[in-house]
């Protein structure tokens, strides 16, 4: 565990910017304008080091009493989303501290975690990339069927993990080693090179890259 930085944000969509060589660079814009530290965990009091972040406004009347007390203790207004990030560098943070987009420098490598788009119930071709049968004489509506999933004698069952039709998407996914193209402190927007998981308006967590280049 190292001195990792993190911000919660909302995916605004994609755009493109010019780089220094005159090429278009595809970027994803992430709003990180309302991040605040709601708690700091230390080894002395909690047994581990971490920082809890809050993001997004919420009606105070819709917050439970325990959470309302938690926010009041930190001296901040209630936040809709909370996340805890492990880091050794907890001394740089304190409850109530606001974090801006300049927490990440331009050119920094980050990992972005979000919830992928839900696709609903999907067949094996769309979900797993199976090959379809030939559309020719004798196939008889087998073009998109999965084929055999378990022989009758051996193994005489369907093994766990068998790739079959089912609900596709709406799972947590992380895209690693993306580059911060720009950090707009005034508007609280990060421009991240490439695509990140999730739809427009989805909540994402931007963290310092765990692997690096």
Curated annotation (Swiss-Prot):
It comes from Bifidobacterium longum subsp. infantis (strain ATCC 15697 / DSM 20088 / JCM 1222 / NCTC 11817 / S12). This is Large ribosomal subunit protein uL3. The keyword RNA-binding applies. One of its GO terms (cellular component) is cytosolic large ribosomal subunit. Part of the 50S ribosomal subunit. Forms a cluster with proteins L14 and L19. Pfam families: Ribosomal_L3. NCBIfam families: L3_bact (TIGR03625). SUPFAM superfamilies: Translation proteins. GO terms for biological process: translation. Gene3D superfamilies: 3.30.160.810, Translation factors (2.40.30.10). One of the primary rRNA binding proteins, it binds directly near the 3'-end of the 23S rRNA, where it nucleates assembly of the 50S subunit. Keywords: Ribonucleoprotein, Ribosomal protein, RNA-binding, rRNA-binding. GO terms for molecular function: rRNA binding; structural constituent of ribosome. Belongs to the universal ribosomal protein uL3 family.
């Amino acid at each position: 565990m190292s001195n990792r930085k993190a911000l919660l944000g909302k995916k605004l969509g994609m755009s493109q910017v010019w780089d220094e060589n005159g090429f278009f660079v595809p970027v994803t814009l992430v709003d990180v304008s309302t991040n605040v530290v709601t708690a700091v965990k230390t080894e002395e009091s909690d047994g581990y080091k971490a920082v809890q972040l809050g993001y997004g406004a919420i009606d105070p009347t819709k917050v439970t009493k325990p959470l309302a007390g938690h926010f009041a203790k930190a001296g901040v207004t209630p936040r809709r989303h909370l996340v805890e990030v492990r880091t050794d560098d907890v001394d740089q943070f304190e409850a109530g501290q606001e974090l801006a987009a300049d927490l990440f420098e331009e050119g920094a490598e980050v990992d972005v975690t979000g919830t992928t788009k839900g696709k609903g119930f999907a067949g094996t071709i769309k979900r797993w990339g199976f090959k379809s049968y030939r559309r020719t004489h004798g196939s008889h509506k087998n073009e998109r069927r999965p084929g055999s999933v378990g022989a009758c004698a051996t193994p005489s069952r369907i093994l766990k993990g068998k790739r079959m039709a089912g609900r596709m998407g709406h799972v947590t996914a992380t895209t690693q080693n993306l580059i911060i193209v720009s950090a707009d402190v005034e508007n609280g927007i990060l421009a991240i090179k490439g695509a990140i998981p999730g739809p427009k308006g989805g909540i994402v967590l931007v963290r310092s890259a765990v692997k690096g280049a």
